[in-house]
Regions:
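Short, Lys/Arg-enriched N-terminal segments with co-localized hydrophobic residues
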Residues: 2-9
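Alpha-helical and coiled-coil interaction segments, frequently adjacent to or embedded
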Residues: 9-34, 45, 74
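Acidic, metal-coordinating catalytic segment for phosphate/diphosphate chemistry
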Residues: 29-73, 80
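Short loop segments at secondary-structure junctions
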Residues: 42-43, 78-81, 90, 159-164, ...
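Conserved Nudix-box catalytic region and its N-terminal flanking loop in Nudix hydrolases
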Residues: 63-118
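Unchanged
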Residues: 70-73, 104-196, 215-218
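Short, amphipathic C-terminal "tail helix"
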Residues: 200-218
């Protein structure tokens, strides 16, 4: 018991130390900017740390410590529970196509669910009926690449009901995939896949067709 208490005290002491001396915005781009932190190691040695943010300088999470999600991704199944809606999208950093969940940014004044419905039509052409049941904590903001950016995103769940046609922007190159479980497993084995998509494909493989959102309940 004494050993455990000592470890807890060490953790508190470590968390209380000073981690940085200052922060500076280094770029002034429209959508994404680079920040430099004058960081301090555990022994006080200074080093350079860099991260990117979509937020303006006053709202970077380094300052606000907010969990507010900048974007969301959509776990959308067909009405029979047999297929998961994916996108295969060209991504410039990889110079290749990646399998992903439909996703996008939450616009000012939108809820995450409203953004999900809008993005589903834009990216896939499918109307989305949002599923609201289950544990609310599963829909809160979670950080995406915390070593590189302060961005967080939430997950929205639902069923696609009607195909009305894609409304992609000219800058987007997106193919819509309706993946059954056999195709989902193939994608996991063979394709280039985003982390969020990979995790939810694993979930889809184990989900019941008759109760596709049962995993949202504790």
């Amino acid at each position: 018991m004494e050993h455990k208490k000592g470890m807890e005290n060490m953790d508190v002491k470590e968390n209380d130390r000073k981690h940085y001396r200052g922060i500076e915005k280094q770029t002034d781009n429209p959508f994404l900017n680079l920040y430099h932190i004058d960081a301090l190691g555990r022994d006080g040695t200074p080093f350079h740390y860099y991260f990117a943010s979509r937020n303006d300088e006053d709202n970077i999470k380094h300052k606000t410590h907010s969990l507010r999600p900048e974007g969301m991704a959509v776990y959308a199944v067909t009405e029979d529970g047999q297929h998961l809606v994916l996108v295969r999208q060209y991504r410039y950093p990889m110079d290749d196509y990646l399998y992903e969940l439909p996703a996008g940014l939450i616009e000012p004044g939108e809820t995450a669910s409203e953004a999900a419905c809008r993005e589903m039509i834009e990216e896939t052409g499918w109307k989305l009926e949002v599923y609201e049941g289950g544990e609310p904590a599963f829909r809160r903001g979670f950080f995406l690449a915390q070593g590189l950016t302060d961005e967080s995103g939430s997950m929205i769940f639902g069923t696609v009901t009607e195909q009305v046609g894609q409304q992609m922007e000219n800058t987007e190159d997106i193919q819509v995939i309706l993946a059954d479980r056999q195709e989902a497993f193939r994608i996991l084995r063979e394709e280039r896949v985003s982390m969020r998509c990979g995790l939810m494909l694993m979930q889809f493989l184990k989900a019941e067709k008759e109760a596709p959102f049962a995993f949202l309940y504790l």
